[in-house]
Amino acid sequence: MTDRYAVIGNPIEQSKSPLIHTAFAQSTHQDMAYGKVLGPLGGFAQAVDAFRAEGGKGMNVTAPFKLDAFAYATDLAPSAQMAGAVNAMKFEGKRVYAENFDGVGLVRDVVHNLACPLRGQRILVLGAGGATRGALLPLLAEQPAELVIANRTVAKAEELVALAQTHQRAAVPVRACGLSDLAGKAFDVVFNATSASLMAEALPLPASVFAPGALAYDLTYGKGLTAFLQLAQQTGVTRLHDGVGMLAEQAAEAFAWWRGVRHRRSEERRVGKEC
């Protein structure tokens, strides 16, 4: 019998996860099907319950449900516990096992696929939601010179700073600030972890945040440049990357976790782009 998997989110029509996992399944000869589930806002648990009742084996979780998945799971891996968010679930009987592969996928894409070492770099992360929580500790493990979390609500960014100071192994300086506090500051790598690009909204960022030669990376993706990457391009940034590579890398981790086999390394970003 074909095993069923899916990605749940809202919106979900833009997701490339089904194409990526189908490519992985074909290359590793796995009998599985992978679809999309549009989760109702406020109805995450009911949507997952229905998928499980139909025989679903596992799900990827995307915005805005990563915190809902954290609450839904019965067994949280250390990566999910640290992040306080979940992006992959595996169903075995009444147990719901949960992982967070976002940070691992992001770091692998940036460091290995894009050949951009993060050690010693000044990093700015925009947003303080589930995506940032998932990426925070893997980014700090790369030992950047500093990491700044900027958010409209500074208190949320400060919560993540406290989390980082409690759990990080490297003594990387981590600070929180509002978006309006970024004037005059420059960074080597700027990550957009907000949902603004999904809504085609540009963030109010000063051009100065992008240091000469900076990398601009949007954790989301779409057709063409996202609103954040368009803004970066307008300020003169040429190293522009969306989250397709991160998506493919975290998908490879989830696929291996579910199926016990791994798609051939080095092909993840290519698969993501082709899909």
Language model regions located:
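Short helix-loop-beta connector
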Residues: 92, 116-122, 210-212
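Conserved small/polar residues in nucleotide/adenosyl-binding loops
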Residues: 268-275
